[in-house]
Amino acid sequence: LEPGFSFSGDPSVVFCVDGTPVIICLQYYGAGGSGIYAYRSLDQGITWQSGVQADLNGANDKVQSACDFSNGPHHGQICAAWDRFFTGAGDNVYISTSDDGGQTFSTSKRIDDANANAIAPDVAYGANSELWVMWADRGRFDVMVDHSSDGGATWGTDIFVSNFNNVPSPIPGSFFRMFDIFSVAADWTNGPFAGSVYVAWHTWKGSAPRHANIRCAATHDGGATWSSVVVNASDTTFADQVFPHAVVDAKGTLNIDFYDRRLDPNNYLLWTWVARSSDGGATFKEYRVSDAGWDHAATESAWFIGDYMGIDASAHEVRPFWTDGTSGSQDVACDVVNLDFFSDVSTLSAATGGVAAFTIDVGPNLGGLDYWVLGSLATSPGLTFGNGVHLPLNWDLLFQITMQFANSATFVNTHGTLDAAGGALASFDTGGPFSPALAGIDLYFSTLVLQPSPAFATNPTKVTLVP
């Protein structure tokens, strides 16, 4: 807490290109109003440097941030975006940028055009350092974006993305506050959807059966045209899905996390799910992340369950963040989700045998390349190739068997070519019961992608042989 302020809140965490974490947050009710401050850590979050002021004004709120990981001219730049109330011109969106890893910030700049009710901005960098900010216009219930091609110095005309139907607050039968906090993500990679921009929001279906769901709009032409789909299209229960947050990973895959109630027949308990698109936002696959549903009313703050979801992704992992109340208290939860390569089972029985079906989904940037599904009895130290790609498998007997007998009756479709989205299906089939002496052995499998030298290796997935 900075001297002279009463409390702080709304933290946004961004990682610089060198891995330095920066927290950008609000400081409330000090002299001059509310401030936007940035804090850096040079020891992986153990200690934090003194705060750096990015802005000080009467009523700042809801700050979000992003870093430019593209190969564009502003590589490494950080941008913070927030809304400001009571400006005399409605509620507006402001940004400030840093070109030195959060040590200093530019003078804040208003970027929205209309004197409207602009609120809750989100920010993302796309290909070639294109900077995108989205927000909700709560006066007209519109989703809006704007973008800058020069590192935030100048901005274009506001772009309309879509209308949305305001979700009731609270949702009927619930107690927690709803708010129009949406998300933007941009493809900063060099893949087939480079430059694409995605906006995710929740909206209300006002006719029976009434419920909230998540939509995502995509543009592949710099915002000139947008097409949107329902993200949670596989849900046939008419349950509520709210509070989306989106990120594009290094393989060009779009990942969106959100709260979801489809597993509760009463449409009440909350789970966290992740939806992924490897085709530029045209279709999504959905995965449950949290272990159990939770009752927001049983926690200490039934009204607030956290306005923000969060999600980030590396080349190998997706990391959703959310408020979780399964303990009876509100906690910040995170999971490491391996959705590039996984098995539908974690065990196979010696008594009956069986099949472990593998899903490969490594993203459109690797689409059309060759792949091997390989196995090993251990993951350490693994194999590191000359170009730095690390395969987390050892060169042992199982490794050699999976190579020699690829595409056999036992190792099915374990060598081939990925589809355009970077996907394939493979399996390990025991062909019936196997020796009980093998029970207790862990088998590890990983996918190696070639172009033709090793280009990428997935995290391993484990299948344990049991009696």
Residue ranges and their predicted role:
Residues L1-D340:
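Extracellular, repeat-based ectodomains that mediate carbohydrate processing or recognition
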Residues D340-P467:
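Residue-level hotspots within well-ordered secondary structure
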